[in-house]
A protein has these predicted regions:
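Extended substrate/RNA-proximal surfaces in nucleic-acid metabolism proteins
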Residues: 2-114
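Short active-site-adjacent structural elements
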Residues: 121-125, 148-153, 182
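Mid-to-C-terminal alpha-helical segments outside catalytic/metal-binding sites
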Residues: 155-183
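Active-site-adjacent betaalpha module
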Residues: 90, 100, 118, 152, ...
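A C-terminal functional module that forms or caps the active site or interfaces directly
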Residues: 101, 112-114, 120, 124-128
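Short secondary-structure boundary segments
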Residues: 115-118, 143-145
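Short acidic/histidine-rich active-site segments
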Residues: 137-153
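Divalent-metal (often Zn2+) His-rich catalytic cores of metallo-beta-lactamase-fold enzymes
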Residues: 1-7, 132-133, 138
Length: 183
């Protein structure tokens, strides 16, 4: 199962970090980026996919126009399942939302949004972030790092770009949001 594979990978990672004397300096938690599926709001075992030690579900939304059904499911995750929803890489969904009705409804729910730091200095992403900030949804940052060859960690560069473009205040707000989420 996914949970068994994740546990195996986590043990391998922990062992490698300890072999390089890096294990004590990092605080690692198991988690999953969970792709939305119809009925997720009623899924009984969804809590097993939250970030370890929290009620946070990192939810990847459909790359399509969002519908009433999607809204109802997200609302159920929050209200019925009592989960804290963190929508993964929100900048990727924008272009699919020809109608903003459900987009706006979802972002009025008590949830958090994650933006990936790659390409923050590009015009299109800057424009998206400026527009998204008006929704006043609490933000956190992600690196979208999947490996050390083609999808490298880029949080430092992204943070520097955010600071240069939007100022220190936004970065401080994001840092406080991240601390509050993971405490």
């Amino acid at each position: 199962s996914f949970l068994e594979r994740r546990e195996h990978s986590f043990r391998k990672l922990t062992k490698a970090l300890n072999e390089h004397d890096m294990g004590t300096s990092l605080s690692l938690r198991k988690g999953a980026e969970v792709y939305y599926f119809p009925g997720i709001g009623d899924a009984k075992q969804i809590r097993e996919l939250t970030i370890e030690g929290t009620d946070i579900l990192l939810l990847e939304m459909p790359f399509a126009q969002w519908t009433d059904e999607i809204y109802v499911d997200v609302k159920k995750l929050i209200e019925k399942q009592k989960l804290t929803i963190l929508l993964a890489h929100v900048e990727r969904y924008d272009s699919f939302q020809k109608s903003r009705k459900i987009w706006n409804q979802i972002f009025k729910l008590p949830l958090y949004a994650q933006i990936n730091t790659g390409g923050i200095d590009k015009h299109k992403k800057k424009r998206f972030i400026k527009k998204f900030l008006k929704l006043q949804v609490p933000l956190v940052l992600g690196s979208d790092c999947h490996n050390m060859k083609t999808r490298l960690p880029n949080l430092k560069q992204g943070r520097d770009s955010l600071r240069d473009i939007f100022g220190e205040t936004l970065l401080a707000t994001i840092d406080k949001t991240e601390e509050r989420l993971l405490k």
